Amino acid sequence: MIIGYKEKEGEIRSSFETRATTKSVEFRVNVKPWATNTEGELISRLYNKERMLNHAAALQLISTKTAIPVPKLIGSGENPDGTAWLETERTHGGIWLDLVGETCRMPPSKQHTEGECEECAQTAQANASRYIQNEILPQLNALRSDTTGLNGVVIPPLWIMDYDPETFWTPKTDLEQKYVFCHGNLHAHSILMHAETLHVMKVVDWDNAGFFPAEFQHWTVTRLGYEEMFTNTERCKEFARLMV
C-alpha cells in the first residue's frame, strides 16, 4: 500500500529496479506498481512491461543497424505475473555525463581542482554534444519507417508522457516514410562517458525509443536543458498533437 495515493480502477503503472546478477551483467525488472513524475509525485502511467520490451527491441535494432554504442542485449521477456525483464552486458569504467563534474577527472598531476570540477563537466558536455550531432543523430535519422512507434507499440518521449500521462497512443502511418528513429529520452543521464578520457562510451535507456516525426529528435547534455523539455508545455502540446 502507498500512503496518500489511491489507485484508480484498471490503471497500469510502472517502476523499474536495476540490480547486478553477475559482475558483467545488468538485470532490470519492473517490480513496483507505481511511477513518479519529475516533482517526485506518485502518478498514473500507461505502459508497464511494454517499456521494458520496447527497450529490448530498440537495443536490438540499434546494435544491428547502426554503429551507436549501446549495451549488449543478452535477453528479455515477460514474467508469469505480467511484469517484464531485461538483461544486458554491464559496462565498466564509465560515469554518467551529469555526474562528471562531481570531481576532477584528470590525472593527479594535471587536476584542475580538488573538489567539484566545472572544467571537466564542460569538456564532457562538449564531447557528448559533438558526438550526438556528428555520430548519433545522422545514424538515427537514417532509420526510416512509415509507422510511428516500434513493433506496433507507441511509447512517446518521456516528456510527452509526463505532459499527457493518460493517453494511450496508437500507431500512425504515413506512406512517405517520414518518421525517423528517436531515442526518446536522450539527455545527460542516458549518456555514459569514459571516466578518464571523457568521451562517450554508451548510450542507454532506450525505453521510449521509436519512430516519430523529425521534430521529436530532441536532446540535451545539461540538467537545465532536460528540465526545460518537461516545463516547455507549449512544445509538449504541439508534439502530442503530432502524435494523433
Predicted features, each with a name:
Residues 1-9, 83, 243-244:
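Regulatory N- and C-terminal appendages and interdomain linkers associated
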Residues 8-149:
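ATP-binding pocket architecture of kinase catalytic cores
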Residues 19, 192-194:
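Well-ordered beta-strand positions
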Residues 31, 78, 155, 208-211:
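Residues that form or immediately flank small-molecule/cofactor binding pockets and catalytic motifs
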Residues 55, 185, 204-205:
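Acidic active-site catalytic centers that drive phospho-/nucleotidyl reactions
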Residues 154-171, 175:
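Flexible internal linker/loop segments at domain or repeat junctions
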Residues 176, 180-181, 194-244:
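Active-site Asp-x-Gly
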Residues 185, 189-192:
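Catalytic-loop signature of eukaryotic-like protein kinases
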